[in-house]
């Protein structure tokens, strides 16, 4: 795919979720297994218009990585940053509609470390603060993480809520408030 399509900077596929013992998880855990082929540009990723690529399946065009200066050593959530940087440079991401990897779900997956995710996604998004919808993107992420943290990490949840202006409150905000104070 990369050879035939010079506009493609990253190629990826879907994933199948397995548990810590290597068993395939039930259907409700497989939201990212049967997604159709999709092509994403910068706005598709940044504005979350289409499901993004799965990190374990990423294959990069060397020229694309070189064009953006490679990975940023100050951002430890490398996949989100490099996907955005490569698409901002004018490339697209093609995601095949087939499973290319299994992803093991266990208690210490990176995405379960809320503080790490919040800090690094904010740091990543700040690299693209010139986008006209930057504030909306930040507030959507803040709302989403507030809801996730509201019954897991109440200190972080309160911090996220305190940075969420009323004009960005939505159903997730109210669900998070209910969890924060009643769970």
Question: Where are the regions that the model predicts?
Answer:
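Conserved nucleotide-sugar donor-binding catalytic segment
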Residues: 13, 34-120
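Conserved donor NDP-sugar-binding/catalytic core segment of glycosyltransferases
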Residues: 1-27
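Residue-level structural signal for beta-strand termini and adjacent loop
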Residues: 30-31
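Glycine-centered small-residue hotspots that permit tight backbone geometry or close packing
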Residues: 12, 22, 69-70, 152
